[in-house]
């Protein structure tokens, strides 16, 4: 049985910080490194056959460069998804392991050089 996913997302800076330290990846959309969140809610639909991947990178603040960690995770998530999308269909668990390793590597590489 095929199904359709309806999704909606937004990102808000909150009341404490001067910059938003959260990010996401949704159907190719994410925020820039330095951002103030979003001013509105975005929404859409996708078919099951599109093998969707939606990700939230929350709670990466509190340390220096939390916004960079969230951005790098979103960027690596999107890059891996675009190059290895068929992995979701073939072996979802392995795909998630690989994408987590890719995101972690991007953040660790940044930490070593900055």
Residue ranges and their predicted role:
Residues 1-114:
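PP2C/PPM-type serine/threonine phosphatase catalytic domain
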